[in-house]
């Protein structure tokens, strides 16, 4: 790859590579997305001066999946080196596994009905400059969480959705 690629071109190139061979059909979503997503995300993180909230943890068989938290931890460490204050936002059992080694904020599990109020209060308390989500499920129109097999996993999930939708700062 040429060292003379512009930031925009590099972002588009990386975005394309990430979805080219994705078996989950992400290329169909990417076609509808505005280009430059990765560059905008990088700039949001770069411009954050203080707290960055990193939501992670996807419920799998009464535990958690492992690739999202590893990516979240890697990003946490980079942000820390850059002088930012990252906070991992997750529910149990992942919260308990991470809280002794990282700055963490606990999401209540299976509390969707109180999630918006909880999130707004947490955002006021934590005052983030950026909020991002790595490997988190998202609520559907019925306020439920499902995995890719269509299994309802709501009772095992903490709700991070409103941290994204109610954040007074850039979100990723």
Question: Where does each model-flagged region fall?
Answer:
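Positively charged, low-complexity intrinsically disordered leader regions
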Residues: 1-51
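Short, glycine-rich nucleotide/cofactor-binding loops
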Residues: 29-33, 54, 58-70
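Conserved acidic residues
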Residues: 50, 129-130, 169
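Short beta-strand segments
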Residues: 55-56, 133-137, 172
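Histidine-anchored nucleotide/phosphate-binding helix
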Residues: 65-83
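A short helix->loop->beta-strand "cap" motif at the edges of active sites that frequently abuts
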Residues: 83-84, 167-172
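Short internal beta-strands
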Residues: 84-91
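An acidic, phosphate/nucleotide-engaging active-site surface
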Residues: 98-165
């Amino acid at each position: 790859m040429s060292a003379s690629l512009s930031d925009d071109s590099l972002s588009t190139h990386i975005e394309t590579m990430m979805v080219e061979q994705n078996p989950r059909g992400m290329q169909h979503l990417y076609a509808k997305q505005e280009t430059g997503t990765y560059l905008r995300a990088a700039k949001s993180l770069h411009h954050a001066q203080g707290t960055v909230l990193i939501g992670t943890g996807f419920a799998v068989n009464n535990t958690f999946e492992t690739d999202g938290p590893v990516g979240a931890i890697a990003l946490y460490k980079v942000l820390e080196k850059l002088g930012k204050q990252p906070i991992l936002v997750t529910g149990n059992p992942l919260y308990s596994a991470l809280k002794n080694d990282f700055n963490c904020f606990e999401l209540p599990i299976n509390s969707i009905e109180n999630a918006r109020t909880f999130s707004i209060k947490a955002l006021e308390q934590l005052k983030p400059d950026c909020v991002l989500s790595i490997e988190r499920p998202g609520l559907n129109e019925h306020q439920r969480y499902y995995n890719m097999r269509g299994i309802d996993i709501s009772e095992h999930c903490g709700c991070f959705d409103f941290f994204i939708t109610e954040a007074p700062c850039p979100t990723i």
